[in-house]
Design a protein with these regions (language model features):
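Acidic, divalent-metal-binding catalytic cores of TOPRIM
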Residues: 2-332
């Protein structure tokens, strides 16, 4: 059974653990807790946050890995701090792994990024980008009650989604270019966590992505992030935008992609519900919400429901097979 921490003790390693604990005064609490609970029999995965637990639980299960302890570190920086605490002459890199988001590390220096044979990075910005993929779109339709559509209808919905997602990514390059410039220039406070896609983008009744003008987007992004608009350099932002264009499918911030995905899925469900095309059978996860006419998907559904539906990532399966699976085979 997969679990998030446990309370098992292994007396055979406690003496060694006590020595390690006594020598580490500034280690993250997560790491010291790990040492106190460590056993040689278990495998461990350090992740950034609670949302990662839901996603990686499902991915591990799809890899036929039935037992691994997932440890939440509360942020990428703390995952790295935990990694740096380990003496790898004492622990196996096949037993202990670290799962982090790639973020923008392919484009700019990320002080919290790190690499090793036991470090897995998402192939896109974050796990949200993976969940909001065309591969998971059909699963989402099922969760919304689209049971009886023909293959041709499903393919049409997927095609329409990809067209709108492409429009979204093209436009969001402006926002990402601004963020990249802020990061590379160390502009503060640059609170881009405050940027809400809904402030400048919405899904129309006929399920199309609609944006405000570039100038309006720029003003809203700078205001929300508490950055002086005088810092805006049109030429440099344009250059960055051109440089990152080919990577647009992988670098749009995950939280922004979530916003598009939820709104778009809600829009098509409402539209088809009004045409009586949804089969709201009892086992439809969200059927009761649909019937009440409320928003069909919320952020909690995004992780709780859609994470579990996401297909297995081949790159993740390969990572698991060459790390924790190897450790378990050797131990058995």
């Amino acid at each position: 059974m997969l679990e998030v921490w446990g309370s098992l003790k292994n007396l055979d390693v406690m003496n060694e653990v006590e020595k390690l604990l006594s020598s580490i005064d500034t280690a993250p609490v997560v790491y010291t807790n790990f040492l106190e609970n460590y056993t040689k029999e278990d495998c461990y995965a350090f992740v950034e946050g609670d949302d990662d637990v839901l996603f990686y639980n499902s991915q591990f299960q799809k890899c036929n890995l039935t037992k691994i302890k997932i440890i939440v570190c509360e942020g990428k920086q703390k995952v790295k701090q935990c990694y740096e605490c380990f003496n790898w002459s004492r622990f196996s890199k096949k037993q202990i792994v670290f799962l982090i988001d790639k973020d923008l590390s392919d484009i700019i220096d990320d002080p919290n990024d790190f690499s090793d044979e036991n470090v897995y990075k998402t192939p896109m910005y974050a796990i949200e980008n993976i969940i909001a993929s065309s591969e998971n779109f059909e699963n989402t339709l099922s969760a919304l009650g689209f049971y009886n559509l023909r293959d041709q209808q499903i393919e049409r919905l997927r095609h329409d989604f990809l067209v709108e997602k492409e429009t979204f990514e093209e436009k969001m390059l402006l926002v990402m270019a601004i963020i990249i410039r802020w990061k590379s220039m160390h502009i503060k406070p640059a609170n881009y966590n405050n940027v809400k896609v809904k402030d400048f983008c919405h899904i129309s009744d006929d399920c199309h992505v609609v944006f405000l003008s570039d100038q309006e987007i720029i003003e809203k992004v700078y205001k929300a992030s508490q950055v002086d608009l005088g810092e805006y350099d049109a030429e440099k932002i344009s250059n960055i935008r051109n440089e990152i264009h080919e990577k647009r499918h992988k670098i749009i911030r995950g939280k922004y992609v979530v916003s598009l995905y939820l709104d778009y899925c809600n829009a098509i469900a409402k539209r088809h519900h009004s045409k009586h095309l949804l089969d709201l059978r009892n086992d439809s996860i969200l059927s009761s919400i649909v019937c009440k006419g409320k928003n069909l998907l919320q952020v909690c559904d995004y992780y709780r429901v859609l994470s579990a539906m996401c297909p297995l990532l081949p790159c993740f399966c390969e990572f698991v097979n060459r790390t924790v699976m190897q450790y378990k085979k050797k131990a058995s």
